[in-house]
Amino acid sequence: MAAGKSTIGKKLARKLGVKFYDVDDMVVTEHGPVSDIFYAQGEQQFRKYEYEAICKALDSEPGIIALGGGAVTYDESLKVLKKRAYRVFVKVPPEQILGRLRRSHTVRPLIGATPSLSKIKELYTARMPRYSHSDYVVEAQDMSTAQVVDQIAQWLHKKNIKL
């Protein structure tokens, strides 16, 4: 949620010369705007669409996949990611997320039109147990996008992970 996953993912994919997949964009292309899906069909249906997009990306050529912040809350998504992908958590503190959301023009269905620190902390706390089991955690609080990209690329190299 507003950690910069899509921006980082695009730049990392470019740096590594691999394909980039944005799960939210894939869902929007297939099913329409995220907020419309949430309001008309509910979060559970959105998570199913998200899972389908994740599977489609995993079945395509190797690359970097940017997930929505809540993707790992859907058990099937988490299972397939654990089995078939390396998971990187870009950790940004709730206060920084709030600042980014306030500057953004995108309404996040689980946050609403007026983001609050308490709501962000609530989601963050609920999701943290799943985030913390990532293969790699980047403490991105005071890092530029380029620094985060470099740190992930270095980790991939160090682990001898080829995409």
Language-model region placement:
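A glycine- and Lys/Arg-enriched "phosphate-lid" helix/loop adjacent to the NTP-binding pocket
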Residues: 84-128
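NTP-dependent small-molecule kinase module
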Residues: 11, 15, 125-163
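Post-Walker A helix-loop "phosphate-sensing" segment adjacent to the P-loop in P-loop NTPases
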Residues: 14-23
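Walker A/P-loop
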Residues: 6
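ATP-dependent small-molecule kinase phosphotransfer cores
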Residues: 22-71, 76-82, 109
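Short glycine-rich anion-binding loops that position phosphate/pyrophosphate groups of nucleotides
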Residues: 69-72, 93-95, 143
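The conserved Walker
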Residues: 1
